[in-house]
Amino acid sequence: MKTLTQIISPIAAELQQFEAFFGQTLKAETEPMNSIMRYVLDSRGKRLRPILVLLSAKLFGEINEQTLRAATFVEMIHSATLIHDDVVDDDDQRRGHASVKAQFGNLSAVLAGDYLLAKAMLLIANDTDILNEMLRTTVAMSEGELMQLSGLNDYLEIITRKTALLMRSCCVIGAMSVGAAEEQIQRISDFGLHFGQLFQMRDDILDADSPENVKMAMELLPVYQQETLKLLEFFPECEIRKALKDLSVFCATRDL
């Protein structure tokens, strides 16, 4: 199986541009917020959501400044939700490092998450279609998290709201940023939703926190992987479609 670095090679240059823009955007005018933002940058994950934005944009056009803003916006939203989740779940570890909550305390973590959310909105305020897409998704994510905390047992609904809708929105706003046609946006939206569902199913299998969820995920994952790959057949053959296919297989079979 290809490594993630190999898979995303068609957008390697654009991903570097994203990293520079993301780092610049996170800078705060005061301490200690700037120190917390540097810590967030140093604790980076796979950047899967910006990768989806960039790949979806490049599938339909040329990556531009609006694409980079959209990718930065979505990573800021994602980072904020992780920081807040660690406060809610009382988790001291995130991506092999101390969580923001463990490193700086609950109050600072809540404020850091709020800072990221507010700054993300400022970044994309003039791109109203992208902003509205992400606001609807953020509402659904909050509802999904509360459904899980409340002990509700609708597995597919919870993972769709908690994870898959954000992945879907990444694909949608990437396509929007290059002026993709409505039908193209709908096609990549369908792909993104299924991709997000299979990603979370694999996560649940690896975490093994809930035997019921593991059983459900193991039953559903092969079906959703097949359907996700099938949805890519609507797009012309190209290196970006191949990258999305390889990324889907990677996320469905990864060990981390």
How should these model regions be labeled?
Residues 1-256:
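All-alpha prenyltransferase/terpene-synthase fold signal
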